[in-house]
Design a protein with these regions (language model features):
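Alpha-helical ds-nucleic-acid-binding substructure associated with the helix-hairpin-helix region
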Residues: 33-102
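Short, charged/polar micro-motifs that form catalytic or ligand-binding hotspots
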Residues: 11-15, 19, 28-31, 53, ...
Length: 171
C-alpha cells in the first residue's frame, strides 16, 4: 500500500510547481498534528490562504516562502530528479533544496525527498524513538558561521540519508 501511495504522490508532485507546493505544505501542516486532520487543514489553507487557522506560528512563514519560491524550488528539484547524478548525490542535493524551506528540518526535508523522488525518508520523533536513535544527531546548526559548522551540517545530512537508507525508508 505504501509504495502505491508514495509513487502516486511523487508523480503528482512532479507535475507542476503548484502540486509540489501543495505536497510541501501538506508536509509542513503534518508537523505536530494527527495525520487525520491534514486534509481539513489543506482545505482551510486553500480557502482562507494566509488567514487559515491551520497556518499558526512558523507555518504561516512557510506558506509565504512557498508561495514566493515555488517555481524556483520546483525547477531546482526537477533538475536534480532528471539529472544523471547518482541517487546518493540526488538525495544530498534534494535535502539541501528542501532544508532551505522555512519550517522544514531534517525529518520533513527527508520526507519531501521521499514524496518527490522516492529518496531519503522521514526519521521523525516516532521513528527516532522506535529505532533508539539520538535525536541530537539530526539537528542542524541554524546559521553556521564557520567552515567547521558548515562541514558539521553536511556530515549530519549525509548521516541522516545513510540512516534512512539503512532502515529502508525509501521507495
Amino acid at each position: 500500500m505504501y509504495i502505491q501511495h508514495a509513487v502516486a504522490v511523487q508523480k503528482y508532485a512532479q507535475q507542476s510547481a503548484d502540486n509540489m507546493c501543495a505536497v510541501t505544505l501538506m508536509t509542513v501542516l503534518s508537523i505536530r498534528q494527527p495525520w487525520l486532520n491534514i486534509g481539513e487543514q489543506m482545505k482551510d489553507v486553500r480557502t482562507n490562504k494566509l488567514q487559515a487557522k491551520a497556518l499558526w506560528g512558523f507555518k504561516k512563514d512557510t506558506y509565504i516562502y512557498l508561495e514566493s519560491n515555488k517555481h524556483k524550488m520546483y525547477a531546482q528539484v526537477m533538475a536534480v530528479i532528471n539529472s544523471n547524478k547518482t541517487d546518493a548525490s540526488k538525495a544530498m542535493s534534494l535535502m539541501k533544496i528542501f532544508l532551505r524551506v522555512d519550517g522544514l528540518g531534517m525529518a520533513k526535508a527527508g520526507f519531501m525527498c521521499q514524496l518527490t523522488a522516492g529518496l531519503v525518508g522521514c526519521m521523525d520523533s516516532h521513528n527516532i524513538k522506535m529505532y533508539n536513535l539520538d535525536a541530537k544527531d539530526f539537528v542542524l546548526a541554524k546559521n553556521p558561521k564557520t567552515i567547521k559548522g558548515l562541514d558539521a551540517n553536511v556530515k549530519k545530512i549525509r548521516n541522516y540519508i545513510q540512516i534512512c537508507h539503512e532502515y529502508g525508508t525509501e521507495n
